[in-house]
Structure formats: structure tokens, C-alpha cells
């Protein structure tokens, strides 16, 4: 807030990451600001985030030409079809309706990805099988990666009628499994601590691995004599991992460990200095590693002065995902710091929050596209993005500085698009007046007239009225409001629309 005693210039200088919402300013200011920014940058390339207020099917269609083959990582958290969600995409769909919601959008999202693109989708037991089947139709069964299990709760539900539901799934597909590989995760302190130098090996700390494997080979089934003279055979039905000749080479190179007394089962020494710079992701993610539902709720609520900025009722219906969970997904699928991430069931904006935080952490330039259709867009998603750009940490809707009085803001340009609905388009069709011709037709003729003539001929000028391009910045449409049957005359940006359609 700018107090009357403050100079606007000094306030701006001391708050360099405070967002300016250009929609709140006159058109002349918007034009001047965008022109100034365009002088130094390609504004489209400099844009960090794109927030689209729209039905996801319409939004994905709009993105096709501009972003085809560019989205490295897709994460969606669609409705779980359980009856517990009160948002615009209502849970408790009939299976067929829910399947249509998903199947209409997955192919469009698939077109936006390169061959090494990765697709993640959160889901629970109710629709996990159906979601995988639908996604397979587009990505192909051969490109299924894994079903990740996420431990979403930190305590059991003792009042559960049957079993305590403590996990969700994250279904994972890639566009081409032959070329996609997961980015390695940072090695944790706990994992690093497991490496010890028990024998003062000059190569440094090491841990030991099993020398036996279950894929049996006669060549690798041989007895091993320990330094103390014990004879060791592979476990029943197994064999050693290496041939006898290779084993003897490893013994000579001090890469086999027989325990401190030299009498134990041989194990392979794996040196910390030789392992990959990171660890391969597992398919079981615990809440200690990636957070839980309550953590996610607290992260979202902390951004708002609940009861004033946003209602308690609205936030109580939210089902956000924890930032640590999304960070894990980004580290696997979008570690490259110029990746583009898409979430077309954006909800409260957790995906954008995670991308902004990761960029803040590693100075990355990742970009994000979020799509959400309900009032949640204006009340939660957009304000949340504005806030996490300005400051890393929040409490009760107030930014929290660190010990050095830094808010850790980041520079961002975020574009906000609002698309008219299909219903709005139909409501703005202007038909030729043919008097009482329609009233004189019988029912069969009326239907034939509607399908074969009226939409094709009488509404032709509405479908692409070239006259509006004489003044493209003044084009308007009647857009439905929250009141039943009410509309409001609003400006439509034809130039921006055609830029997206043309790519």
C-alpha cells in the first residue's frame, strides 16, 4: 500500500517486485507501458507466465498453433469424480461424462509436447484405471512410464468405513519412451550419509551392493572363496552378477567387500565419487519427502487474509497439491531451466507457485501456462501468482521477510487471457430477418432449415464479419455474467486472438 507521505518513485524503488495489474489502468496507460516494454524486449518471449480464464478445451485449442511441440512437462490434477469437490468441474460425474471431460483434452495437450515431453496426472482409486486407459489411447500403451504412489496423509483416518485412504496416484506417460529419460533427483543428506569408508579406500566413501541377481546364468554360478577360506555359493535360483574372471579382477582392484572379518557374503563396493550426480526417482513418494494435503492447504491459505481477500467457504473447497510434490515433478520432467510447463486444471495455482519457487531457487527461466475456468481464477489463482512473485513466504496474507529483510521477489511478466465461451459465441450470432417464414414450417422442415441453412447462411456474417477488422481494437461482444440470462458488453482483442490462431 502506498501511503500519502511516500513518494511514488521511492516506493517503486523499494518494492521492485510489486506487481502492476494493467487491467486496473486506463487503456492509454496499458498501451504506453506495453510499448515501453516492447522497446527493450520481444514481449512475447519475455513473458514468464500465461494465465487463461477459460474452459480447458477452448484454451487448448487456442494454444495449438503458438505452442505446438514446445510444452516439455504437463501436470494436471483433474476432478477425482468422488462427489467431494464444489468447483466448476464438479466431482461425481457419471463415468461417461467424466471420461469425455478427460478424453477431449488429452489429445490437444499431446499435440503441444515434443517427443521427449512428459505427462503427469494426479488421481485416486476411483478413476485411476479409466484415466490410464484414456491417456493410453493418445500416448500409447508403450509410452506408459509408471504409476507413482503419493502418500497424501500423515495420519490414518480411523473413522474410515473400510480402509484408510492414505495415497493418490500420479499417472505418468511420455510422448516417446525410447528417448525420454527422467532427470535425476538431488541426492539427499540421508542418502549421502549411507556412504562410509570402512577400509580407508583411497577412492573415498562407498556403500555396498548385492553381488547376486535372480536372472540365472550357468556361467555366473560358481563358488567364491572368502579371505578366511569360507566357500560361498549364490542364493538358490540365483547367480552372481559378474563372471568369475570379472570377479577376480574386482577383487584385485579392491571392489569386493567380505565384511570386516573377511568371512561374509561378498558384496560390490559402490563409490560415491563414481555414482551419478543424483538418484533415480522411485515410484513411492512419502509425505516426509514431498508433503501432504494439510501442508498444501496451509501453503495456499498463508497467501490470503481469509475472510477479507477470499472467503473461508471457497478455500475450504480447495484441494491443492503441496509445493514439494510439484517440485519433485518439475525436477523429474522440467529440470532444464528453460522448460515450458502446462497445467490445464489449474485450480488454486499451485503449479505456477512451484515453477516460480524453483526458478527463484536455481535462477531458472522456466515458463508456465495455467488454465482455469471458474470464479476461482480471479479470487485465488491470479492473486496467488501475484503474491508469490512479490515474496517467497506469506502468513495471513502478509509477505514475510527473512533475517536479511529480503522478500526474495522475482521479476515476472504474466499475461492474463479471458476467452469467451462457446455459449457466448452462439448468443452473439446475428441472423437475417425472414419475417414469419420459420413459423409457417412444419417440425421436420424447421429442423432441416436450422441444420442445413440457417447456421450456414443466415449467421455467415457473424462467423467472420470482415467489417469488424476496420477497427479491430473496438470490437465488442455480449458476454454472460453471473446473473441468469444477463450479459455485459465487453471488448474483444481480435489482434491477440488472431496472433494465437496464426501461431
Regions found by a protein language model. Give the residues of each.
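Mobile active-site "lid"/loop adjacent to the S-adenosyl-L-methionine
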Residues: 72, 79-101, 114-116
Amino acid at each position: 500500500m502506498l501511503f500519502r507521505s511516500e513518494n511514488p518513485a521511492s516506493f517503486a524503488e523499494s518494492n521492485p517486485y510489486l506487481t502492476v495489474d494493467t487491467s486496473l489502468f486506463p487503456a492509454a496507460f496499458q498501451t504506453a507501458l506495453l510499448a515501453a516494454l516492447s522497446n527493450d524486449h520481444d514481449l512475447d518471449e519475455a513473458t514468464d507466465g500465461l494465465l487463461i480464464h477459460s474452459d480447458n478445451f477452448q484454451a487448448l485449442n487456442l494454444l495449438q498453433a503458438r505452442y505446438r511441440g514446445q510444452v516439455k512437462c504437463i501436470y494436471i490434477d483433474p476432478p477425482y469424480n468422488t462427489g467431494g469437490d464444489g468447483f466448476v468441474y464438479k466431482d461425481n460425474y457419471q463415468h461417461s461424462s467424466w471420461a469425455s471431460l478427460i478424453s477431449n483434452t488429452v489429445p490437444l495437450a499431446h499435440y503441444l509436447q515434443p517427443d521427449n515431453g512428459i505427462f503427469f496426472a494426479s488421481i485416486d482409486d476411483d478413476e485411476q484405471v479409466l484415466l490410464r486407459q484414456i491417456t493410453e489411447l493418445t500416448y500409447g500403451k508403450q509410452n506408459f512410464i509408471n504409476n507413482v504412489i503419493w502418500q497424501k496423509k500423515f495420519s490414518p483416518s480411523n473413522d474410515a468405513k473400510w480402509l484408510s485412504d492414505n495415497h493418490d496416484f500420479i499417472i505418468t506417460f511420455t510422448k516417446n519412451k525410447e528417448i525420454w529419460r527422467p532427470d535425476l533427483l538431488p541426492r539427499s543428506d540421508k542418502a549421502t550419509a549411507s556412504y562410509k569408508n570402512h577400509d580407508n579406500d583411497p577412492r573415498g566413501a562407498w556403500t555396498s551392493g548385492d553381488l547376486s541377481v535372480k536372472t540365472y546364468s550357468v556361467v555366473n554360478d560358481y563358488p567364491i572363496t572368502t579371505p578366511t577360506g569360507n566357500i560361498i555359493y549364490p542364493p538358490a535360483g540365483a547367480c552372481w552378477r559378474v563372471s568369475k574372471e570379472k570377479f577376480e579382477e574386482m577383487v584385485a582392484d579392491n571392489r569386493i567387500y567380505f565384511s570386516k572379518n573377511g568371512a561374509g557374503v561378498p558384496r560390490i563396493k559402490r563409490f560415491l565419487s563414481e555414482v551419478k550426480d543424483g538418484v533415480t526417482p522411485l515410484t513411492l513418494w512419502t509425505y516426509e519427502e514431498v508433503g501432504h494435503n494439510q501442508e498444501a492447504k496451509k501453503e495456499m491459505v498463508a497467501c490470503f487474509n481469509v475472510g477479507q481477500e477470499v472467503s473461508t467457504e471457497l478455500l475450504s473447497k480447495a484441494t491443492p497439491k503441496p509445493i514439494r510434490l510439484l517440485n519433485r515433478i518439475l525436477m523429474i520432467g522440467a529440470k532444464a531451466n528453460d522448460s515450458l510447463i502446462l497445467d490445464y486444471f489449474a485450480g488454486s495455482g499451485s503449479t505456477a507457485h512451484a515453477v516460480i519457487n524453483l526458478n527463484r531457487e536455481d535462477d531458472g527461466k522456466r515458463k508456465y501456462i495455467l488454465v482455469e475456468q471458474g470464479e476461482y481464477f480471479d479470487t485465488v489463482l491470479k492473486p496467488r501468482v501475484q503474491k508469490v512473485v512479490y515474496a517467497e513466504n506469506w502468513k495471513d496474507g502478509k509477505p514475510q521477510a527473512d533475517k536479511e529483510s529480503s522478500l526474495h521477489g522475482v521479476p515476472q511478466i504474466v499475461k492474463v487471457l479471458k476467452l469467451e465461451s462457446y455459449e457466448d459465441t452462439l448468443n452473439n450470432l446475428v441472423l437475417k430477418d425472414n419475417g414469419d417464414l420459420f413459423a409457417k414450417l412444419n417440425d421436420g422442415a424447421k429442423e432441416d432449415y436450422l441444420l442445413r441453412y440457417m447456421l450456414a447462411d443466415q449467421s455467415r456474417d457473424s462467423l467472420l464479419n470482415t467489417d469488424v477488422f476496420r477497427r479491430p481494437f473496438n470490437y465488442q461482444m455480449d458476454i454472460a455474467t453471473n446473473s441468469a440470462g444477463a450479459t455485459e458488453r465487453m471488448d474483444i482483442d481480435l489482434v491477440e486472438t488472431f496472433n494465437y490462431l496464426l501461431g
